Structure formats: structure tokens, C-alpha cells
Amino acid sequence: MSDVPGIVVTGGSGRMGRMLIETVRGSDAARLVGVTERPGHDWIGADIGVALGGAAIGVTVTDDPLEAFATAQAVIDFTSPAATVAHAELTAQARAVHVIGTTGFSPADLAHLEAAARHAVIVRAGNMSLGVNLLVKLTEKVAAALDADYDIEVIEAHHRHKVDAPSGTALMLGEAAAAGRGVALADVSDRGRDGITGERKRGDIGFSAIRGGDIVGEHDVLFAAEGERITLRHVASDRSVFARGALKAALWGQDKGPGAYDMMDVLGL
């Protein structure tokens, strides 16, 4: 097993962190070599197997990401924008593949990630699942085929704990729709309607976000015209689809040169 890539999972106590740990541990193509958590977390210094309620596996949770990254060939990161930006500088130093599923980045954050990608392989996507990335491609094709008589709305739903909106996946879908129409999303995006808004502006791409319960992730792209509607839909029922995609990205990046990649590159779409 020592000849397979070593993976570090950041934010191991979170919902995605736990799923990533389970996915890596269950894979014959990778091995778990590190888990990080924020300073002061109860798990610091504990064996991750014990922290998760099982037997020790010889991997200690640390609050020193550079130490953890130094032993890894890839880092899988579903944390916060601030943490991910800090991690990007360290993965570049460690020459480890950095797989980023974090969302909610500011333009300044993205600039930092682009700078880090000059020295490291960074695979970043708002969604790591095959189904969603196929949906992105379909959205672009449908948007290109239909004119502005078809109003485009992106509707997404997630669990009550999600802190950013629209979701990274919704923005991916919006970007795809805008690309299909040959426009910039920033010029046509409508992210909030409240009160007397007036009529819908022709050509706009609207976003709606739902938060509640334990919804893993649901995304609809609606093309609505007079007399007919087309809906493209993806429903994730289990976070394992994201974890499997992230691990696939980590393995795919092993023989790639420094640069910024996404799941379309990983999946060859």
C-alpha cells in the first residue's frame, strides 16, 4: 500500500471530512496519511480512527497543516475560504495536489488560488460529482440552443448548515448557461427578488436558494418560455458522490504539471 498516493483530509470532523476519510480508507488506490483540524479542536492529538469511534489506525489529527502536507501526495480540502487559501500556499510548498471542494470564495481569494496554481496542481470545483458535471455540460448546450424567449432560473436546495448562497454548483450552472448564450454571468445574474421588483428582465439568469433540514444537494435549471418549460435536474442523496469525485481528482492530478484544473478536466468532458 505504501506505493499508492498518500492523502491528507482537512477539516476531518466535518460532514464532508468524515465522508472523505471513509472513502480514502476504503480505497485500494490511496492511503490516508493525515487529517487536520483547527487549533483547539477536541480531536487534536487523537488517532483519527479512535476520534471517529473505531480502532486506532496510526494517523494522528494535527493542527499543523504544513507538517501533514509534507507527507502527502494530495490534500483534499472542503473547509472554509480562508482556510483553503492558507492551505493553498502550503500545498504549493509541499508540491502536493490540492483538491478543493470549498465554495464561497471572494475575487481576492480566487486570485490567491490562481497564484498558488503556478507552483502546484490545483483541482477546484463547486461540485465533484459526475452527474453534476454532466448537468453543467447539458446546461450550456441547452442554453446555446434556446434564445432569450426562454427565461433561465437556477434553483438549489441544501441543508440548514450551509453558509453560502448561491451554492458553488448553482454558480457553475449559471456560468454554463451564460457561456451557452455568449454573455458574462456578472452582466445577467439576478440573485435576489424581494418586494416590487418589476417585470423580469429579458436575458437574465435568476438564482433561488433553499435551506432546510438535511438536504444533501438538489439543483434545477429551468428554461421557461410561453407555452412550455424544460427542467434539467440533479439530486444528490449521499455525500459519498462528492467524496468519490474528490478522490478521483486527487489521483488524476498525480502526473499533471502545475496549473488550475476542474472536474471537467478530470472527467475528460
UniProtKB/Swiss-Prot annotation:
UniProt keyword annotation of Cytoplasm present: yes
PROSITE patterns according to UniProt = DAPB
Residues bound to NAD(+) are G11, G12, S13, G14, R15, M16, E37, G101, T102, T103, A125, G126, N127, M128
Supply the EC number(s): 1.17.1.8
One GO biological process from the UniProt record?
lysine biosynthetic process via diaminopimelate
- GO MF annotations in UniProt: 4-hydroxy-tetrahydrodipicolinate reductase; NAD binding; NADP binding; oxidoreductase activity, acting on CH or CH2 groups, NAD or NADP as acceptor
Please list the residues that bind NADP(+). Answer: R38
Q: Give the primary localization class.
A: cytoplasm
Q: Where, by residue number, does (S)-2,3,4,5-tetrahydrodipicolinate bind?
A: H159, G168, T169
A single GO CC term, please? cytosol
Q: Where is the active site?
A: H158 (proton donor/acceptor), K162 (proton donor)
Q: Which InterPro entries match?
A: DapB_C, DapB_N, DapB_N_CS, DHDPR_bac, NAD(P)-bd_dom_sf
Localization terms from the record: Cytoplasm
Functional pathway: Amino-acid biosynthesis; L-lysine biosynthesis via DAP pathway; (S)-tetrahydrodipicolinate from L-aspartate: step 4/4
Give me the reactions it catalyses: (S)-2,3,4,5-tetrahydrodipicolinate + NAD(+) + H2O = (2S,4S)-4-hydroxy-2,3,4,5-tetrahydrodipicolinate + NADH + H(+); (S)-2,3,4,5-tetrahydrodipicolinate + NADP(+) + H2O = (2S,4S)-4-hydroxy-2,3,4,5-tetrahydrodipicolinate + NADPH + H(+)
Q: Which domain of life is it from?
A: Bacteria
For this UniProt record, give its keywords in alphabetical order, as a comma-separated list. Answer: Amino-acid biosynthesis, Cytoplasm, Diaminopimelate biosynthesis, Lysine biosynthesis, NAD, NADP, Oxidoreductase
Q: Which family does it belong to?
A: Belongs to the DapB family.
Tell me, in a sentence or two, what this protein's role is. Catalyzes the conversion of 4-hydroxy-tetrahydrodipicolinate (HTPA) to tetrahydrodipicolinate.
- Name of the protein: 4-hydroxy-tetrahydrodipicolinate reductase
Organism, by scientific name, is Dinoroseobacter shibae (strain DSM 16493 / NCIMB 14021 / DFL 12)
